[in-house]
Structures are given as C-alpha cells and as structure tokens.
Amino acid sequence: MTAREQLWYLINGVIDGSYEVKIFCDEFERIYNFETDKAQLTEQEKRGFEELFRMVARFSEFEEDLKIPNMYFSKEEILAKAKEVQSLRF
C-alpha cells in the first residue's frame, strides 16, 4: 500500500470508527510528514491532507488544552475535517 493509499485508509477508518482519533492523528502525522511523496498527490489531496495534517499535529484530548484559543483541536474538529477531506475524493 502506498503512503497515499494509507492516508485514505486512515481517513476512512477514523470516520467509520475503526480507529480512535488519537491513533489516527499519530499515524496520519507520521505517514504524511515522513513517508508521503507530495508530488504524487492531486492538488485537492495536497490541500486537504495539508490542512488535516496541521490539525492532527495539534490534536489534544485534554479539556484544559482545548480551552486555549486557537492552539489545539478536539476530536470533533478532527472528525469534521476528516469528513471534509473525504468528500474531496468523491
């Protein structure tokens, strides 16, 4: 499976509940940042994956963190962005 395919697999998995958001964020960040050849992505994928990457890198499951304005993203925000990115594919 290519890195691109792995990213889509993770997105589909977090949306359907196969992955917890924390695990999704860790894996998406690692694969996108270190294993993905961005030249192989479509323009829509580049934009969507980059936006999602910026969010997963700042995911927190702690309420205290989430109270800091414009710093961290919640589970709900990550899932909403994943669904938005998924909609770009179809």
Predicted regions and their residues:
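Acidic, Ser/Pro/Thr-rich low-complexity regulatory regions
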Residues: 1-90
